[in-house]
Amino acid sequence: MLRELRIGDMVAKLPIIQGGMGVGVSLSRLAGAVAKEGGVGVISTAQIGFEEPEFEKDQAKANLIAIKKHIKKAKELACGHGMVGVNIMVALKHYKEHVLAAVEAGADVIISGAGLPMELPELVDEKSHTRIAPIVSSKRAANLILKMWAHRYNRTADFIVIEGPKAGGHLGFSNEQLADMEHMDYDSEIKEIISCTKTYEEKFKKHIPVIVAGGVFTHEDVMHCMELGADGVQVASRFVATEECDASDAYKHAYLNANESDVQIIQSPVGMPGRDVRNGFIRGLEKKKQPITKCYNCLEKCNPATVPYCITKALIAAVKGDMQNGLVFCGANVGRINRMTTVHELMSELVGA
């Protein structure tokens, strides 16, 4: 039986974090269902307000309304079990506002990547209920963040998420590293990152749980991560093919129908490589740049005149089921997903129940 996951004074019965997926793939329904099973359900705040009536006119306002709404709803669905958190990308233009809204709404955890969350401790009071974690992909990034947090804020991470090269969405690796992924000894890197956290555990006299993500697919994968020294795992792609996932049926079927050969790496307007399902949208991009008629002000660094497509428009189209105009991010193992399931069944499978 897997041990429970402790983060601060909170306990998740199952050491499974459902990874945040945006836009609109992991919202309150999915996160609440995962938490209810005793795991950690994570809502993506990326353009989370896309269904709010204010969105077309004021995206920033709509997103803040939706952050609070979805955290509240997920907690209600969880019925006091597990934890409900948010994933907030550092690359977002309104990063600070998203963090403050999540804290105000009572998010149990904030997980932050797609950049280095150097200022996160400044935004989340250590005495608040909310616990914080950076996403890292290398020992170098882990040490850089933990060293900065210790020096500037006299504080360390409440937990850390290590995201490996098989993860979906935005990736903390170069295109060259991803192309040679099969020859990468990432287990050694995981051990190095865990070793790095021990230094800060000693300094701050607290345990820093380590969560491993990227390519975790089976119970055997979960156990392998635990054997490496992890306290838990983060799984994202497999939760797309659940009844509770917030995405459209067409989005889910894009996963079910994908083969290994359909998975590719593209350059995202975020400025990082991203893993996605090759579809009509991607094939169209290879022929010509998509015209951008409106900027949704989602990213801190994005020039509509130079990026090949609008990531907001593409991700919203996908989650609503428009696959010809939609970008479908996925993990490296999406080709192995071949049937629909439920959150309960998937969680039971992952923990070997």
Enumerate the language-model features and the residues they cover.
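Active-site entrance/lid segments in N-terminal catalytic domains of soluble metabolic enzymes
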Residues: M1-K203
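Conserved active-site-proximal phosphate/metal-binding subdomains
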Residues: I17, A167-I211, F217-A353
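Residue-level detector of alpha-helix initiation sites
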Residues: V25, V216-F217
